């Protein structure tokens, strides 16, 4: 009997604004028709994808939904799936939300994030005695402020949490958020020591490992993918290290076997947007 998967961490409401183009500083752009509100964040995106893929797969959500209309919306949307257990979702504070600016021309997105209650989510908010799953997936490192805090023994509180999940017999899986700055090596690296599955994009991998994967000219350095994946394993990833990007997806298992697949060639206009694409991968 399948024990299932727990998706923990960020529970967010995304408000997506389609824009004509990304403006320069002090310039204006138009928001076009099609403003949408949807659930977002690692928990909501990943768990709803899994629920669609296998309606019989037991799923558990762990995170915070605020005492507000947005929190009601999150629970209502996830409650549509009979195989998602919401008993470990706590109502606390204000629901996190993200204003997503989606460029109509390039389909690229830019995110403006309000942490809300997510800022306080931590190890003690998980009912470890009742949690009985095969895989514990958490995201996002760099967007869960309490778990990003330092820990004298483990480096970060996130690393401590992941080790606890492993000691409880679960395989661990992590995701990170894309951001500018120098926090990747400091916050992601400690977590990798207690990670079985690491699935992140090329820019996040580059900032974590220091291996050049995409230059300032936008060119993808496919020839460096294997070295980057090897580095993730050296940093502690136990089972699968996976990198996804628009052009390809590639991975390396615990035995050093390297796999690479090109993206599907789809008709122009087929892809309506890329919000949640990384979680879906």
What do these predicted ranges mean?
Residues 1-16, 72-91, 101-271:
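Ribokinase/PfkB-type carbohydrate-kinase core domain
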Residues 47-48, 206-210, 271-281:
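Short, small-residue alpha-helix embedded
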Residues 1-80, 121, 267-274:
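Glycine-rich phosphate/adenosyl-contacting loop at the front of the ribokinase-like
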Residues 93-96:
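Short, basic and Ser/Thr-rich N-terminal targeting/leader segments
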Residues 37-44, 68, 152-155, 222, ...:
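Electropositive phosphate-/nucleotide-binding environments in soluble metabolic enzymes
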